[in-house]
Amino acid sequence: MHELAMKKCIGKPIPEWDAAHRLEIDQSTGPNLQDFGTIFRINSIFMDVIEPSFLEKQWFIFGITISFAAALNGPYIYSYAYLGSDPLSERLITHLMALTFIFIFGGITWKFGRGLFYGLRHQPIRFHRSLNRLYAIRSRRYFAKPGEGDIVWEAPWSTESIFCLHREETSFGVFFHIRHYTLSDNGNVARVFSIGREWTGYGQIGMALAQWNYWCAYMNDGPGDLPKPMLFHTQQETLREAFLFSLYSFGLRAPAIVRLLMMPLILVFTVMRVLANATCRDPIWPESIERISQIAPDDPYAEPRPGTPVGWGDTILAQQRGEYPDNPQAPVKDWKGEMDEQKNAAAWLENPAAATRRTARGRP
């Protein structure tokens, strides 16, 4: 979800649906824990995670490009009216149309295009288990002082923190993602950011809950017993990776015929993603965060390490060779609730608090 789309919550109470579907850091939400492609790197000290727009930014770039092209029609319409011999009244109408194109579509381009171009290639969210805090890079700092880094928000990892499963209903369907809310003194939303990836439709709620369990297991118990992530995303995106991001945005397991039909659009998405990345730079952590994020050279849990596949292409090839697990997951320790992931997700959606109480009592 685009950052500006979340700002509609600022100054208002937490959305009612979100408030009813809070995620607790000390209570498992399902029988499994699994990562579904949200991780850059992991070690004993911290874990860097993506935010939703990282996977889908080619769609935003495509929309911004169309909006920019529409805005360029304004000067064309104006020149047509200026050079024409139409009556003054008709030329005034044409001038008004030109200004409308410029201001409306130009405004959309400026509002939603900032950050996609000349911003950051990615905005990692750092789960820092040593300090029980989250550090989220939110935007590029263009005139930073030495050591200041980019703009970072902090959030405590505590039972008082407000994490929710957010539901977004659009004309393309229902989407879910995990959010953190920071409230002001009057109880309204002061800050909000999303973590990880989006989940499409109610059928993927079980996956979202398994992903939350994965992050909680890391923060609460460390990386020792975690299954491998689905993949480690590259922080140095290549042309091949840009193509695979665009290809898989139509579905990881989309039929070959669908991919062939969508190939022209996939290629356009690839070019746009590459061009946008070329205008951006890598994020810079403030020195204060870098100092507390030093890992030991012999950290046994530091990944990716030499030999570990990174990115879509290398990971898929490693899986085909049997060198990297396919669909790695693990059961939640001491889980007492419903063992069927879909049934558990349905019960949690209907009433999260009641589902948690039943699980605590050992009832499915």
Residue ranges and their predicted role:
Residues 2-3, 48-62, 144-145, 185-193:
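Short, surface-exposed beta-strand/loop "edge" segments at domain boundaries and coil↔beta transitions
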Residues 1-39, 201:
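Short, non-transmembrane cytosolic segments of multipass membrane proteins
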Residues 40-56, 176-178:
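Short, hydrophobic/proline-enriched secondary-structure or compact coil segments at domain edges
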